[in-house]
Amino acid sequence: MSGRPAFEQFTAQPPQPAGEVVAQQAGDGAQGQELTISKLENAITSMEEQGLQNDHRHAKAVLLKQKLQSGLPDAVPGQENGGNQQITPAQLNQLRAQVSAYRLLARNEQVPANLIADAVMLRPKVTTLLPEPYEYPGEAENGEKLPYDLMKIFNLHQIRCNRPTTISVPSGIDPVGMLKQRENMIQNRIGLRMKLLNNLPADIPDHMKLKAEIELRALRLVNLQTQVRSEVMACLKRDTTLETALNPYAYRRTKRQSLREARVTEKLEKQQKMEQERKRRQKHTDLMQAIIQHGKEFKEYHRNNLLKMAKSRKAVMTYHQNNERERKKDEIRNEKLRMQKLMQEDEEGYRALLDEKKDQRLVYLLQQTDEYVDSLCSLVRQHQNTEKKKKKEDKKIEKGNQMDEEARVHVRERSTGKALTGDQAPKTEEIEFWLETHPEYEIVPRDQLSDDEEEEEEEAPVEPEEEKDDQYAGMDEETKAKMILEKARNEEDEYDQKTKKQMADYYATAHKIKEKVVKQHTTMGGGDPNLLLKPYQIKGLEWMVSLYNNNLNGILADEMGLGKTIQTISLVTYLMEVKQNNGPYLVIVPLSTLSNWQNEFAKWAPSVTTIIYKGTKDARRRVEGQIRKGAFNVLMTTYEYVIKEKALLGKIRWKYMIIDEGHRLKNHNCKLTLMLNGFFHAQHRLLLTGTPLQNKLPELWALLNFLLPSIFSSCGTFEQWFNAPFATTGEKVELNQEETMLIIRRLHKVLRPFLLRRLKKEVESQLPDKTEYVIKCDQSALQKVIYRHMQKGLLLDAKMSSGARSLMNTVVHLRKLCNHPFLFPNIEDSCRAYWKVNEVNGTDLMRVAGKLELLDRILPKLKATGHRILMFFQMTSMMNIFEDFLNFRRYTYLRLDGSTKPDERGDLLTQFNAPNSDLFLFMLSTRAGGLGLNLQTADTVIIFDSDWNPHQDMQAQDRAHRIGQKKEVRVLRLITANSVEEKILAAARYKLNVDEKVIQAGKFDQRSTGAERKQMLEQIIQADGEEEEEEEVPDDETVNQMVARSEEEFNIFQSMDIDRRREEANQLHRKPRLLEEHEIPDDILKLSFDYEEMERAREEGREVVDQTPNQRRRRREVDYSSDLLSDEQFMKQVEEVEDENNQAVAERKKQRKRKMAGLDENDDSMDDVVLQHKKKKTDPELAEKINEMLDVILEYKNEDGELIADVFQTLPTRKELPDYYQVISKPMDFDRINKKIETGRYTVMEELNDDMNLLVNNAQTYNEEGSEIYVSSETIGKLWKEQYDKFMNPPKPVEEPVKKKEPSTPSTSSSRPSTSGTPSVSDLQRTQQATAQQMLMLMTHMQSLPPAQAQQFQQALMTQTGGNQALMLQYMQSAMLAQRAQASTKVTPKKDEKKETSSSVKTEEAKKDDEPSTSSASAPPPKKKKESEDSEDPMEEDEEEEIIGQKKEPASSRRKSRPTRRFSNEDEEEEDDE
């Protein structure tokens, strides 16, 4: 009772119809009966209006009405006077209790249980109209008492007969009773469940305890939920009963309304409506006012919030700005303090300040390494425990079940990490399509998935973390940093006995279980006493067995040629013999080395059952049965078949997966790595590689991640950690040798347990040495011409309409050109057509390429002394050309590249390695023939072109330098001088440098002491700062020294060179060994000249029509205002210039050579051909004067007695100071200046002045103002200016009036007056730009005209210069130089003086445009010059016609004279600067 809501308890019994109550009140007369019938009719009508016809109360009301109308008795027989009975006290108490309960329910209050018991008197439901048995007994004839008297209950049967429905509604099942029974059952079950949950055992898992506690609390809240629901339902159902829903006034007697009452009612109604309307309007007004007020408050609130936020933001910004300002002040103060210490030569103080800046970074790095090593220790322990459990599980799985099981690939959702396994995972053959349709999933390695499942099943007990910083507690930051650094400097080696006794370090944690391997086991070697493992190979076997025992995977990274294959075979046989582990073992090798592995297994382990899984589909199908049965020990296959046959091979649970040339897995996302991780399950993995570190450190991480994904899981952490000492951080304060060594020693701890690497020079002492030489080759003239344009991205092609083709990958084409120009078919076609031959072969094929020319000198010497050669190429097309060369020289050779079939490779190796083989040379491609080949019968390796990856070249070298080699190995690397190949070589050396620091300096041979590793690391770091000087192309003697192995061979090679030169000298038509420029096809030369002219035209602003990229050169300018002379100085300079011209003409007549016609830069038409003279050497007097001027600067000392020029003598290298070469585009130092003086590059003093100004400007640009170098550069600039002014303006006694005239000379061509009355530099330059061309023409004609006409020209010259003596001197000097050039250049016949004068003038103009200058003024556009020439000098037209006529000279005449073309002056200077 108490568990049910109050309203349900009251409504549990069906309510009595209202008609029954009325009938009881009206039982004493017909008048009361009529009234009762009328009320019943009203009730029935009201219920019908409300649609309650189906209600049981409606049916009972109708039945009662019928009874009253038919006059049937309404009382049970024997109770006729029941209507007059008085109410009993029990009924009165029940009525009062009902009234009280109704009042409580109306107020929605709780009804007490005793009140409910008094108000509801349950009585059994009457299911029949019959009285109780023996209530009206009857008597039978024999005196027997019967239960009923039939006459007394006749009326009851009569009522049943008069019912309107003959079939009564069956009573059925009492729903109230069933509901009570159901509730009792539920309550019992709830009680039992709560009792069970209270008595749960204490050892259940935590997640089960949590679920039980949640369920128990929910069950306890059932009663509260029921009570709340009952209260809510009471509010909802209060107005839904019949008594409250019907209109109570319907039961009143209708009163007739009078007219007065109607009027009063209408009036009251109107008043009520008006009041309601007023209230509605007032309510709406109040609502609007509240909304408006709320809006105002809302806006005000948020406005205040914004103001508060703005104030807070401003306060925070002010705080950080103040902090930043203070920090910058501190930095500036410290910087000034360091500079002050440096200026005061306080080295100790400067070093202390510098260390203070670097210690923070170093301490951070050391702390990071400690944390990383500690985390790896825990990961290694966890990995070992997991692997132990996996081994136990693998033993329970039968092989047959695994083979029959349908292979499925485990995948994982990237975002959530949820893995799909079992039937939910996709099948092997459907994985590719499934991944395309589900891009959010990725393949997860089976080993890694099993690790995760193991972690979920059982949580390892967490060891309490030890506090690491206890020893530094209570110290300030500075003391703590010093303690960390001191500890790192004094750190003992981890292999020391003291360290082993103190605690288990990182290596001891990994190799906890140790097993000694003393001698070779019996199954290794097949019983042959000659097949014995070397001591270092037994050590390698012991290391691999230790990995097996400790459930780890590793990398056997011995240097190439130390027998990694044999050591791997010894591991397999050891596990089979000692550990009773018969496999299966999966060995994945490159296709080129598969036959070698097969031979080694047959030789060293004949008892091991091996399967070679390769070949066609039928061949592979023949061995599938044996594979499915597991009737083998070792299965050898290649990378391709592993990917192709993953469905078959992935079902086998391999004991060991061995991958040869493991650096194939250096890309973490490559297909091979994904397939091996996703499809294959192996207990142990082993990688074999000779180059564990190739291009980048993440590649080493990829290998470790493939082996141990649970330990090396984050590439970002690994790369960030390792790259600190190597990568450029952008900070000027770099780590010194000691600090770099401290960090690298820490990093070696990570790699040492998983990496074993021994070098041949350490373990194989009887192996002969290997020496590598870089031989620089010269370029032929054809290569130089094409290379110069190819650097701009153009390939000269006469077949193209534009004359050239744009190149996309310029570096690749430059490499091709360095190898051989005939790698471009259009170049070969042009040469073939120009030389009038069907095919270019023989010596011509060698003469066009510098590398072939060098090999033509080297190969005969090696052939004569019995050496055999391996030659490696990057391009197979170059191998085709080299084959033609070998056939021409009749050398026997073999060739192996990517197109060679796998079955043929073994035959080629057998032929070359045969004892009496006459094969001299073996051509191989670096990628196809550089792996796994044994070619130790050769002793010379020639790398024709280098690979970007230096380890590819090292692999190629070790094809000959390996176990079994008896001779000294000589490696020759061919590099084209001043080409892109030098940059490739530099990049390769940098990669090898990283390899040395990380791998080799780690000394992963498991026996080196800490002192040895520290010494080796110091040597490597010290070598970083040493940069080799640029080597020139070696001569024959130098090459012989590189190639010769002994003094005897050197003498033989020298004599062979003498014989070769003698033979070439006796040839009838002797040709130089390299192609010269007059032999280059005319179409290529013409295209080269045209594009050079286009470049000049673009620089000068002329319009050109071409399709070439717009790349402009930097032009040098001429300063015309450098010398302002008086009249006497002017006349003396004119006389000196005339003397110099006469002397130069005499010298040029003796040393005159053939010239080639070139294009004038100042002509509008690119077809105007003029003579271009070769650059002259430095005059001896000028060179002597230059040396005297430089000696003054080089010998100048500062106050401390130090030479200020020492810092500027030699610039630091690009490796030492890379940011300098990013800021300074054109570096300059005194070494470069001295080199130009020695080679005669300075023809005039202005060129040296430009270089000196460049040197000073560079120093002031890069260094800060006030620094020591900056001050020294200012001193050098002042000293040079004094020397230069003395040279240009020698001291002469000058009269005083003359000095006064000089500043008062006006500039007639300047439109802007000078403020001081003296023409400014810009005014003079503007004057020179406007009149330079006209005056040069006039001065040239003055020398060949009669005196009267020459005087007219002189007057015109004075008019144009405005009487400026300096300008007149400048023009006179230019005229003299033009006359000197005219006298030294006599290729065309001298028909008249006008033609010579015009040619000389144009040549002089071209020379003046090429001269360097530091002035900011630039020459006006050529079109303006042309216009001024046409307006001032009408004779220019006749001269131009003669010059244009000269351009029509046919090309055949130029070929007959065979002129020698040279590089332009600017090109030579740019090459020298590079």
UniProtKB/Swiss-Prot annotation:
Residues 263-283, 383-427, 442-475, 1098-1119, 1136-1161, 1287-1326, 1382-1474 are annotated as: Disordered. It is an enzyme of class 3 (hydrolase). Changing residue 1263 to A: No obvious defects in viability, growth, development or brood size in vivo. Significantly enhances lethality of pbrm-1 RNAi knock-down. Enhances brood size reduction phenotype in a pbrm-1 mutant background. GO terms for molecular function: ATP binding; chromatin binding; DNA binding; helicase activity; histone binding; hydrolase activity; nucleosome array spacer activity. Residues 1177-1287 form the Bromo domain. Residues 1207-1270 are annotated as: Interacts with histone H3. Changing residue 346 to N: In sy598; enhances the multivulval phenotype of let-23(sa62) mutants. Keywords: Activator, ATP-binding, Bromodomain, Chromatin regulator, DNA-binding, Helicase, Hydrolase, Nucleotide-binding, Nucleus, Repressor, Transcription, Transcription regulation. Residues 272-344 form the HSA domain. PROSITE patterns: BROMODOMAIN_1, BROMODOMAIN_2, HELICASE_ATP_BIND_1, HELICASE_CTER, HSA, QLQ. Residues 545-710 form the Helicase ATP-binding domain. InterPro entries: BRK_domain, BRK_sf, Bromodomain, Bromodomain-like_sf, Bromodomain_CS, Gln-Leu-Gln_QLQ, Helicase_ATP-bd, Helicase_C-like. It is found in: Nucleus. Disruption phenotype: RNAi knockdown results in 100% embryonic lethality. When RNAi is restricted to mesodermal cells of the MS, C and D lineages, which include the somatic gonadal precursor cells, results in gonadogenesis defects with increased expression of the head mesodermal cell marker arg-1 in somatic gonadal precursor cells. Residues 450-469, 1429-1443 have a biased composition (Acidic residues). Residues 854-1005 form the Helicase C-terminal domain. Changing residue 697 to P: In os13; temperature-sensitive hypomorphic mutation with weak embryonic lethality which disrupts asymmetric division of T blast cells resulting in a phasmid socket absent phenotype in addition to egg-laying defectiveness, protrusive vulva and other vulval developmental defects and which exacerbates the reduced vulval induction phenotype of let-23(sy1) mutants. GO terms for cellular component: chromatin; nucleus; SWI/SNF complex. SUPFAM superfamilies: BRK domain-like (SSF160481), Bromodomain (SSF47370), P-loop containing nucleoside triphosphate hydrolases (SSF52540). Involved in transcriptional activation and repression of select genes by chromatin remodeling (alteration of DNA-nucleosome topology). Component of SWI/SNF chromatin remodeling complexes that carry out key enzymatic activities, changing chromatin structure by altering DNA-histone contacts within a nucleosome in an ATP-dependent manner. Selectively binds the N-terminal tail of histone H3 mono-acetylated on 'Lys-15' via the C-terminal bromodomain. Component of the multiprotein chromatin-remodeling complexes SWI/SNF: SWI/SNF-A (BAF), SWI/SNF-B (PBAF) and related complexes. The canonical SWI/SNF complex contains the catalytic subunit swsn-4, core subunits swsn-1 and swsn-5, and accessory subunits swsn-3, swsn-6, swsn-9, either phf-10 or dpff-1, and either ham-3/swsn-2.1 or swsn-2.2. BAF complexes additionally contain let-526, while PBAF complexes contain swsn-7 and pbrm-1. swsn-9 shows similarity to both BRD7 and BRD9, mammalian BAF and PBAF components respectively, and may be a component of both BAF and PBAF. This is SWI/SNF chromatin remodeling complex core catalytic subunit swsn-4. It comes from Caenorhabditis elegans. The gene is swsn-4.
